[in-house]
């Protein structure tokens, strides 16, 4: 046995891409990968299980790479066909993680083993053996506090997700990671027996019919080369890629043996077939499989319009990873391009498998009229580059096809033309127009930089996309205009709403992840104003449920902010009519309580105006308003929609539509109709679990042992936000 101190804990993440196209993408998507995980029972709980990464031990003096590859093969033999096991391409050390408990002071290494792209091979499920899981499904429920994973495995999976995201942004890294191993790339190895460099190697050690001297003499007798040409690229570090003209995948591969009884043998006169007939078959198959591509390629405007009316997708990629608009732009079909953009609402920056855009194709073909159409489109990214970092102008000047001079002139002029703008609204209804330097490829981060906010103020806010009944916070790398374009599909995925009644707009709003301790330190008047406008909006809409006394105080502050100091002649009993109350009292209280509050509101308003200890500067009053809002449980929450079921009688259930609020304090349920706060749970006092179908999640309160299920298509978003915000509470906030 080896020395225990020389034995290292090693965890292995075996990952494989679902398709080859994802390897060339600069944007990381977890759903494009699968990861190999074990399921092991939780100690003391027979029925419950948790997922763990593959784990092995490494001797300090052993060959690590081969040891890990052999371990993966042996571990996966029971689940693979013919007991072959999964053979990794290489072993990459990602990171070392400190261990807890008895092993404190030691570290465990996480090794990544990339495997082949997923195919139709069917793996058998064997109890106790690992199986592949979709990485996106795993990351949706992965957190260090989740009962679904071992704590160390959860930390490693979160680090792996971040690592893959960073590596996708590096050119050529991901394709190199999944490239076949050097051993796989060696096809033939030839050794010259006459080449003996070791002094101890004699003719007897060659074990061949000829001695080394005889072989050497025969070689010298052969005709020698007159010229020797060296490859100047050999041994250099220059990047190169093999250009593939066409990739053809056998659709029947992996489907098993065919039913030979159904195979029809053609007549003998048809046996001799030329390559041209084979090509014709392939073209006919392409025409049948991709009618929209064919009509775009041929410029058949009538057929193209009819297919679009039949809901054929403009985003579908064919076997060459081209979309219909790529064919229209490459072959110079002007009307087809216009129809795809206008009627088909096609993304003008849609990329093919080699990351080339429609503008690249039109410029490369020298089709000036199509270049003009694309440049006139408000969402086109004029600065877009392909996989090799080339702009459309570079491609145009390289190819020099057709009317390339005119196309190049248009591209050069477009660089200095004014950019399209998008309105970013604030919650008070005002907006700022921001330039879209990259069309609909412009990211949230780039829009935030165009908002003319200071660096300090930017960190408190982000861009939200909102319609009447759905609001989503976007991430810095998201492209808001593409979300606006895809809003009907997003609505269908997350709600049952009618897209015709939901018009999306972009808003500058408080970042839901902003800790209250940080917000309390804000002094910038502009930041305070933006926060105030949003808090006032949520208060009046009824999302801030609070005691009557708190709502009356907030109403008096709003009167001071809107109308200035109290004047007895001006602000009489009838001053607070129904119209004025709408601007200071939540909509849920207007009819039930607001008429009885008028005297109390005016009284507090008068006291506030005459108080010498209160600053009447606008940002100080707005800050006082925020200070009162900070105490409300739902302050700063992102709201989702859902339903809960309660027993109306022993025989049936009552459906209650609810708002699900998630903030840095915890989770809150509001009755959708009355805005009454049904339940408010702080982190640490409840547990959650995502349902199997991602259409519900379960909440268990540890204080009163109560459990309930919320049914919503947004369950995945709710659980992911809970995992992000859990643990962000400051110690001083936990008891407040």
UniProtKB/Swiss-Prot annotation:
Tissue: Low levels in brain. Very weak expression found in heart and muscle.
Function: Component of the CCM signaling pathway which is a crucial regulator of heart and vessel formation and integrity. Negative regulator of angiogenesis. Inhibits endothelial proliferation, apoptosis, migration, lumen formation and sprouting angiogenesis in primary endothelial cells. Promotes AKT phosphorylation in a NOTCH-dependent and independent manner, and inhibits ERK1/2 phosphorylation indirectly through activation of the DELTA-NOTCH cascade.
N-terminal domain similar to Nudix hydrolase domain: region residues: 1-170
Record keyword Cell cycle present: no
Outcome when changing residue 185 to A: Strongly reduces ITGB1BP1 binding
Membrane topology: Peripheral membrane protein
Gene Ontology MF term list: GTPase regulator activity; microtubule binding; phosphatidylinositol-4,5-bisphosphate binding
Localization in the cell: Cytoplasm, Cytoskeleton; Cell membrane; Cell junction
Gene name, Swiss-Prot/TrEMBL: KRIT1
One BP term from GO: endothelium development
Residue ranges, annotated region (Interaction with ITGB1BP1): 172-195
ANK repeat intervals: 287-316, 320-350, 354-383, 388-419
Protein's UniProt name: Krev interaction trapped protein 1
Annotated stretches, region: Interaction with RAP1B: 430-452
Disease per record: Cerebral cavernous malformations 1: A form of cerebral cavernous malformations, a congenital vascular anomaly of the central nervous system that can result in hemorrhagic stroke, seizures, recurrent headaches, and focal neurologic deficits. The lesions are characterized by grossly enlarged blood vessels consisting of a single layer of endothelium and without any intervening neural tissue, ranging in diameter from a few millimeters to several centimeters. CCM1 inheritance is autosomal dominant.
Impact when changing residue 179 to A: Strongly reduces ITGB1BP1 binding
CDD domains: FERM_B-lobe (cd14473), FERM_C_CCM1 (cd13197)
Effect on the protein upon substituting residue 430 to E: Impairs interaction with RAP1B
Keywords recorded for this protein, A-Z: Angiogenesis, ANK repeat, Cell junction, Cell membrane, Cytoplasm, Cytoskeleton, Disease variant, Membrane, Repeat
InterPro entries cross-referenced by the UniProt entry: Ankyrin_rpt, Ankyrin_rpt-contain_sf, ARM_KRIT1, Band_41_domain, FERM/acyl-CoA-bd_prot_sf, FERM_2, FERM_central, FERM_domain
Quaternary structure, from the entry: Interacts with CDH5. Found in a complex, at least composed of ITGB1BP1, KRIT1 and RAP1A. Interacts (via C-terminus FERM domain) with RAP1A (active GTP-bound form preferentially); the interaction does not induce the opening conformation of KRIT1. Interacts (via FERM domain) with RAP1B. Interacts (via N-terminus NPXY motif) with ITGB1BP1; the interaction induces the opening conformation of KRIT1 and competes with ITGB1 for ITGB1BP1 interaction. Interacts with HEG1 and CCM2; greatly facilitates CCM2-binding to HEG1.
All copies of domain FERM, residue ranges: 420-734
Domain of life of the organism encoding this protein: Eukaryota
SMART domains reported for this sequence: ANK (SM00248), B41 (SM00295)
């Amino acid at each position: 046995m080896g020395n225990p101190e020389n034995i290292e804990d090693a965890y292995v993440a075996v990952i494989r891409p679902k398709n080859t196209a994802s390897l060339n993408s600069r944007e990381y998507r977890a759903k494009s990968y699968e990861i190999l995980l074990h399921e092991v029972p939780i100690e003391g709980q027979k029925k419950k299980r948790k997922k763990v990464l593959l784990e092995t031990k490494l001797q300090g003096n052993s060959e690590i790479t081969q040891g890990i590859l052999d371990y993966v093969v042996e571990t996966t033999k029971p689940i693979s066909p013919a007991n072959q096991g999964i053979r990794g391409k290489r072993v990459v050390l990602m990171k070392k993680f400190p261990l807890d408990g008895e092993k404190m002071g030691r570290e465990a290494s996480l090794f990544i083993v990339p495997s082949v792209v997923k195919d139709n091979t069917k793996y058998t499920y064997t109890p106790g053996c690992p199986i592949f899981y979709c990485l996106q499904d795993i990351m949706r429920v992965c957190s260090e506090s989740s009962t679904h994973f071992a704590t160390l495995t959860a930390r490693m999976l979160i680090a792996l997700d971040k690592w893959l995201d960073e590596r996708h942004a590096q050119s050529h890294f991901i394709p190199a990671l999944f490239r076949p191993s050097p051993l796989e790339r060696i096809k033939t190895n030839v050794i010259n027996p006459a080449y003996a460099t070791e002094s101890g190697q004699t003719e007897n050690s060659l074990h061949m019919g000829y001695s080394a001297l005889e072989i050497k003499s025969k070689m010298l007798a052969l005709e020698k080369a007159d010229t020797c040409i060296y490859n100047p690229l050999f041994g250099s570090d220059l990047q190169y890629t093999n250009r593939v003209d066409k990739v053809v995948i056998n659709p029947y591969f992996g489907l098993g043996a065919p039913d030979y009884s159904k195979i029809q043998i053609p007549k003998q006169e048809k046996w001799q077939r030329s390559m041209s007939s084979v090509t014709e078959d392939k073209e006919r198959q392409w025409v049948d499989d991709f009618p929209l591509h064919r009509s775009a390629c041929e410029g058949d405007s009538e057929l193209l319009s009819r297919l679009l009316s039949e809901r054929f997708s403009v985003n579908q990629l064919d076997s060459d990873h081209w979309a219909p608009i790529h064919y229209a732009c490459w072959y110079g079909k002007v009307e087809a391009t216009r129809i795809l953009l206008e009627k088909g609402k096609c993304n003008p920056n849609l990329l093919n498998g080699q990351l080339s855009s429609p503008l690249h194709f039109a410029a490369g073909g020298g089709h000036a009229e199509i270049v003009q159409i694309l440049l006139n489109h408000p969402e086109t990214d004029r600065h877009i580059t392909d996989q090799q970092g080339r702009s459309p102008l570079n491609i145009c000047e390289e190819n020099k096809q057709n009317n390339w001079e005119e196309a190049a002139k248009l591209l050069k002029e477009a660089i200095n033309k004014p950019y399209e703008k998008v309105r970013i609204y604030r919650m008070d209804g005002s907006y700022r127009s921001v330039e879209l330097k990259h069309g609909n490829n412009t990211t949230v981060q780039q829009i935030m930089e165009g908002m003319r906010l200071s660096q300090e103020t930017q960190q408190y806010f982000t861009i939200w996309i909102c319609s009447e009944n759905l609001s989503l916070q976007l991430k810095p790398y998201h492209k808001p205009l593409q979300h606006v374009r895809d809003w009907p599909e997003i609505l269908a995925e997350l709600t049952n709403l009618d897209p015709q009644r939901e018009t999306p707009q972009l808003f500058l709003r408080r970042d839901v992840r902003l800790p209250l301790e940080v917000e309390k330190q804000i002094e910038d008047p502009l930041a305070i104003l933006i926060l105030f406008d949003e808090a006032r909006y949520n208060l009046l809409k009824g999302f801030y449920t609070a005691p009557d006394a708190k709502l009356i105080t907030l109403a008096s502050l709003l009167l001071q902010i809107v109308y200035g100091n109290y004047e007895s002649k001006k602000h009489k009993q009838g001053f607070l009519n129904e119209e004025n109350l709408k601007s200071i009292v939540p909509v849920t209280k207007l009819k039930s309580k607001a008429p009885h509050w008028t005297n109390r509101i005016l009284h507090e308003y008068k006291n506030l105006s005459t108080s010498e200890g209160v600053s009447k500067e606008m940002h100080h009053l707005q800050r006082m308003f925020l200070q009162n809002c900070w105490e409300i449980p739902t302050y700063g929450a992102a709201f989702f929609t859902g339903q809960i079921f309660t027993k109306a009688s022993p025989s049936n259930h009552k459906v209650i539509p609810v708002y699900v609020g998630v903030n840095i304090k915890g989770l809150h349920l509001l009755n959708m109709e009355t805005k009454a706060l049904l339940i408010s749970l702080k982190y640490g006092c409840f547990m959650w679990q995502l349902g199997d179908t991602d259409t519900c999640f379960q909440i268990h309160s540890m204080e009163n042992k109560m459990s309930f299920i919320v049914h919503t298509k947004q369950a995945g978003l709710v659980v992911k936000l809970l995992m992000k915000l859990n643990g962000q509470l400051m110690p001083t906030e936990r008891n407040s």
